[in-house]
Amino acid sequence: MDLKILRDKQEVGAAAANHAAQSLRRILARRDWARLIAATGASQFEFLKALTSAPGIDWHRVELFHLDEYVGLPITHAASFRKYLLERLIRKTGITRHHLLDGERDSGEVIREVGGELRSDTVNLAFVGIGENGHLAFNDPPADFETEEAYLVVELDEACRRQQVNEGWYSSLAEVPTRAISMSIQQILKAEEIIAVVPDARKAAAVKACLEGEISANAPASILRRHPNTTIYLDRESAALLSQAVSRSI
């Protein structure tokens, strides 16, 4: 695992986007299609803005999947991850081959359909974040590290739901859905390359737990340390609690 610490979230977004753009160009040079998983949330704003402006990427040859979606949330809601990806990635790039998780449909049917498409070929690149509770996608602690299902329905813990309020997606905890469809941990780890974009001081405790603590279901994103080709981008604030030894050696 490679660790990059930049000055602020703007530098994180620019550096991670440059890395992602280079990876996509390399993939498209050797394959007809690049198969991509994208993350959502406030931590991805600067990254996706920079990436969608990067030159030399044939986005019409990119097949897109995403990590998670709330069960029962309409696409018109500001917090809908389908809405997020349509506005911040798909429409800006012209991606036409995308598989969005429809939280308004029967979850079992969505999981079968999108999971089947996801597993039909190798995923080349995955963009992820780390939650304030250490979650990876919506796999809150204690996460299921064993299931081989592509997606699963999960119960969202209170820390995760409060994060959504604090980021401004909802005005109260009562408004935040309690269940979501989430890509599984094992499915995320099947990606050939993972780029994690994790700025902000509010992520510092989770970053420390995931990078310095035991690899544990209680710190779900700690599992990224077992992936052979992962790069984590932090800013000074999200890296603030790391020991110097860790920040130098990872």
Residue ranges of model-derived segments:
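Glycine-rich phosphate-binding loop
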Residues: 121-146
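Glycine-rich beta-strand-to-loop/alpha-helix junction loops that act as flexible
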Residues: 38-43, 128-132, 199
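Class I SAM-dependent methyltransferase SAM-binding "motif I" and its flanking Rossmann-like core
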Residues: 137-183
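N-terminal glycine-/serine-/threonine-rich phosphate-binding loop
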Residues: 1-36
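ATP/nucleoside-binding phosphotransfer catalytic cores, i.e., glycine-rich phosphate-binding loops
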Residues: 183-186, 190-250
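Glycine-rich N-terminal segment of FAD-binding domains in flavoprotein oxidoreductases
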Residues: 25-55
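A glycine- and small-aliphatic-rich helix-loop capping segment at beta-alpha/alpha-beta transitions
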Residues: 49-59, 141-150
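Ligand-binding beta-strand-loop-alpha-helix segment within the catalytic cores
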Residues: 58-127
